Amino acid sequence: MSWLPLPAATADRDPFERVFALRPNLFEAWRDFASLFWTRRLVDPVVLELCRLRVAQLLGARYPQSVRTSQAQSAGLKEARIAALSDWWNRGDFDATERACLRFAEQFVLDAKGISDADAAAVVSALGEAGTVAFVEALAIFDGFSRFCCSLDVEQAADGGAQRAAGERRRTPARSGQ
């Protein structure tokens, strides 16, 4: 559990939303911005999800590792691929686009100034210019909010990953009387 004093009224929310509930005005703006990467589809949602999860792995961010985006799941991303993610360098089941983006994402997290021209060119070749801009912006979100979760000790999702990832809107069932 986070060390922050979380409002009791948020007990039914996932850990990330509970922490962000301390500043609801920021949460709405952030969620709207972060969701654009998944809805605009300038980058394949499977590639985005693999990179989001790899960033979280590298930073040791428990919450981001415990959730999955519905877009990536709908696009066919399976848990077996996610389980292989920490060893992607040594595996042949990651395609050229995924490999270029994962290489770039790792370097972004570890030392952004160390991204080589060749690594950037591989991403531009795979995603195009607009896709590359969207990808780098998404990496900034993934990196920043993975670090946010680490700093505030946001725990993993209680349901083992069935929740949506940060940026996806909550689908709440209609309540009786409303």
Place the predicted regions along the sequence by residue.
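Mobile cap/lid helix-loop segments that border enzyme active or cofactor-binding sites
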Residues: 1-49, 69-73, 166-178
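A ubiquitous short alpha-helical element
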Residues: 14-22, 88-93, 103-108
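Short alpha-helical scaffolding segments that buttress acidic/His motifs in well-ordered protein cores
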Residues: 34, 50-55, 85-89, 101-109, ...
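Conserved alpha-helical segments that form or flank metal/cofactor-binding pockets of metalloenzymes
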Residues: 52-82
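Carboxylate-rich helix-loop segments that flank metal/cofactor sites and access channels
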Residues: 77-94
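Alpha-helical transmembrane segments and membrane-interface helix-loop junctions
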Residues: 94, 119, 156-159, 163-175
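Charged, amphipathic alpha-helical coiled-coil/dimerization segments
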Residues: 113-121
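Transmembrane-helix boundary/entry motifs in multi-pass membrane transporters
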Residues: 128-129
